Swiss-Prot record:
Residues given in the record as S-adenosyl-L-methionine binding sites: 168-172, 195, 216-218, 268-270, 293
Residues with PTM Tele-methylhistidine: 154
Record's keyword annotation contains Thylakoid: no
Predominant place of localization: cytoplasm
Protein name (database record): Histidine protein methyltransferase 1 homolog
Organism: Homo sapiens
Taxonomy of the source species: Eukaryota, Metazoa, Chordata, Craniata, Vertebrata
Listed result of changing residue 154 to A: No effect on automethylation. Loss of protein-L-histidine N-tele-methyltransferase activity toward RPL3
InterPro entries tied to this protein: Methyltransf_16, SAM-dependent_MTases_sf
Subunit structure: Interacts with GRWD1 and members of the heat shock protein 90 and 70 families; these proteins may possibly be methylation substrates for the enzyme.
Region called Disordered, residue ranges: 30-55, 68-103
Family per similarity comment: Belongs to the methyltransferase superfamily. METTL18 family.
Amino acid sequence: MTFQFNFTIEDHLENELTPIRDGALTLDSSKELSVSESQKGEERDRKCSAEQFDLPQDHLWEHKSMENAAPSQDTDSPLSAASSSRNLEPHGKQPSLRAAKEHAMPKDLKKMLENKVIETLPGFQHVKLSVVKTILLKENFPGENIVSKSFSSHSDLITGVYEGGLKIWECTFDLLAYFTKAKVKFAGKKVLDLGCGSGLLGITAFKGGSKEIHFQDYNSMVIDEVTLPNVVANSTLEDEENDVNEPDVKRCRKPKVTQLYKCRFFSGEWSEFCKLVLSSEKLFVKYDLILTSETIYNPDYYSNLHQTFLRLLSKNGRVLLASKAHYFGVGGGVHLFQKFVEERDVFKTRILKIIDEGLKRFIIEITFKFPG
């Protein structure tokens, strides 16, 4: 089974990031901010304006407090748990919210993959991984050139601006390996790839026969330029995937259009994303499985993440979360998040796997304590 994904970087960043194969893919081993303590404080407290980051009008951030977010309209979640969760908010300043929107699948799928170079990555026994590599040109994205912002600030994360969606973080591969080892079943399930970035987790669910897959990332550019091309590149006919007569870098594959209807794409902050999907005219069916990797690095986001699980996870569903034990420089980590969850008494957590290579990492399952 071929597994392809698009990873977009700028030429001048290729030496700055860690290449896996000829600079085609970057895998960061720590998700630690390479900024000073004073810079970290400034990033947490700074208010981002459209003028400061040269954002166009259609990418304006919504600056409003968490208290103004609309309450959940769903009735499936335990009411007592929801009430408890709302009454236990974290201390400290809440990040500004970015409006959520849905991204339509382009009609011209062939054009989306034009001038893309497909390369196969080594190291996976049961899944063949390939890269669709493109170059991000500044002139094409003058308003939201988040890669340049990240580079100029010497940081992989810019709070409220860029949340790391252009990198493939290490724990993503841990979770992919767990899927294979634990024989995780996706067939017939509705799946959310939360904080999707390149979309590898959701693409795995897509290939595994999920009935519906939603991809969400904070940045709209990540969805348009990374996630969408990856999904299209991976929705190919099996006979073309197995064609070895042409080298990977030359092969042009026809999109499996009949399967793409199962995929939907969203950008924006988590609470705004919840409001968007729950406010649709059609009755929203909650997710059987939420997949997320390296999303608990910042304690300021824990309340929104917890509320997202509460509002969108089906009563018998589960979350599979991959994370490092601790994120130096931003303060989050597994034990702090587990404590946060335990205090709210809504979900229970279970450690499925511990990876001791390099920085200690975990695969965690999250389910409702009282699903009834």
